[in-house]
């Protein structure tokens, strides 16, 4: 197979039977590129968001705690240079096959959330028109994870274009599409955890509807704190 990240041809992942039958499994990146992603662990960093720090809680989580917003996140990987390149190709250059890179890891991680309804963070209409797919839904579909698409997002510019103060001043961007789909235990799934502003808005919206048990899951988390 030709790696979609480094474009090198990699035959090391093929079994003898696959080579004979010429029916290789659909790996889309090589082992070298896959190994460049840094897995996160709560045991080695922030106990509430998985940022890799030398304290039990990072400044971002302390900040949100003072605002009365509970932080309960789990993230698979650190947002390093390899992850930055991956998301650039997947989200902004539209290489849709890259949705399959973390399928195995997502399946394994979400098994711990039995009894939770999976809710993907939506794109705005403008964002969807530009990208033509929701990357979070693409991850879930690749892993055959059922989900409820109960949130919608207003148009209003990209979060990544805003600084800390601008993110904090943003009015509520999210609305509920169908309150009848609400459940007691919700797992909000997003791609990258940055400041927590997006998740704080979603949590506020859901808590106003009486939902208290809300957890969050991310593919990747920035290693630095935005509110320190």
Task: Give the location of each predicted region.
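Glycine-rich phosphate/pyrophosphate-handling loop used in enzymes and phosphotransfer proteins
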Residues: 1-228
């Amino acid at each position: 197979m030709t790696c979609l990240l480094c474009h090198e041809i990699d035959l090391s992942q093929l079994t003898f039977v696959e080579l004979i039958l010429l029916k290789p499994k659909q790996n889309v990146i090589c082992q070298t590129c896959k190994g460049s992603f840094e897995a996160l662990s709560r045991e080695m960093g922030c106990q509430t968001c998985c940022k890799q720090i030398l304290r039990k809680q990072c400044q971002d989580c302390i900040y949100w705690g003072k605002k009365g917003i509970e932080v309960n996140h789990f993230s698979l990987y650190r947002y390093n240079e390899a992850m930055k390149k991956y998301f650039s190709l997947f989200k902004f250059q539209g290489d849709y096959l890259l949705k399959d890179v973390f399928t195995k890891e997502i399946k394994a991680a979400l098994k711990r959330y039995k009894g939770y309804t999976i809710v993907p963070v939506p794109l705005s209409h403008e964002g969807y028109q530009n990208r033509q797919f929701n990357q979070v839904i693409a991850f879930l579909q690749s892993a055959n994870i059922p989900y409820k698409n109960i949130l919608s997002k207003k148009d209003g510019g990209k979060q990544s274009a805003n600084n800390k103060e601008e993110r904090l001043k943003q009015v509520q961007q999210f609305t509920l599409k169908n309150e009848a789909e609400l459940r007691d235990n919700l797992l909000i799934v997003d791609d990258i955890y940055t400041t927590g502003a997006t998740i704080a808005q979603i949590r506020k919206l859901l808590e106003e509807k009486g939902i208290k048990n809300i957890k969050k899951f991310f593919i990747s988390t920035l290693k630095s704190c935005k509110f320190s």
